[in-house]
From Swiss-Prot:
Residues 35-52, 131-148 are extracellular. It is found in: Cell membrane. InterPro entries: CASP/CASPL, CASP_dom. Belongs to the Casparian strip membrane proteins (CASP) family. Homodimer and heterodimers. Keywords: Cell membrane, Membrane, Transmembrane, Transmembrane helix. GO terms for cellular component: plasma membrane. The lineage of its organism: Eukaryota, Viridiplantae, Streptophyta, Embryophyta, Tracheophyta. This is CASP-like protein 2C4. Coiled coil: none annotated.
Length: 184
């Protein structure tokens, strides 16, 4: 009877799936948030493209979700190769994949965190207004839009935190692999 994967591999899978789900939820909540209001006989629609930082966050969160789904598939494929015995002679390839995974995990975490913080900063103007520039508080008018945007950004922040933990998993995986003899 074959034993299942180690608990660290299971934890990485669960965390990757959670990060993919949270990033996708953030992108979907932000992407489908829109609200139309009539102000002084003029209909005005609030959409994420009105705030450039929100649009960038949607793209970044969707790309991060796709990346983590691909990494999850890689985890399952590597386990399948290890079970069938087909991956025995590719240590250098395994180290290269671990290095690429580490760098991409770090980059993905930084990208999602940076775009989320930029979107939060841009949305605080809509939430609080700027008296010096006579910008009104838009969230008093577009309440549902602001609530959906806030939920999307919370999902993206949770995904970024999970991605930071995943980069620690990737670092552990990379530095546990032995170097090839010619580099020692």
């Amino acid at each position: 009877m074959a034993a299942g994967p180690p608990s660290s591999v299971r934890a990485e899978r669960v965390l990757r799936a959670a990060c993919a789900a949270m990033a996708a939820a953030g992108a979907l909540l932000l992407g489908f948030s829109a609200q139309t209001k009539t102000v002084l006989f003029i209909q005005k629609k609030a959409v994420p493209k009105d705030v450039q930082a929100l649009w960038v966050l949607i793209v970044a969160a969707a790309a991060a979700a796709a990346y983590h789904v691909a990494q999850l598939a890689r985890c399952f494929c590597m386990e399948r190769l290890a079970i069938t015995g087909g991956g025995g002679g590719c240590r250098r390839l395994g180290r290269a994949v671990a290095c690429a995974s580490f760098l991409l995990d770090k980059g993905c975490a930084y990208m999602v965190f940076a775009t989320t913080v930029a979107a939060l900063q841009a949305c605080f103007v809509g939430l609080l207004g700027v008296d010096a520039l006579q910008w009104s508080k838009l969230c008093n008018i577009y309440t549902r839009f602001c609530e959906q945007a806030a939920a999307g950004m919370v999902c993206s922040l949770l995904a970024a935190a999970g991605m930071a933990v995943l980069s620690a998993f990737s670092a552990r995986d990379l530095f546990r692999r032995p170097c090839s003899p010619e580099y020692r």
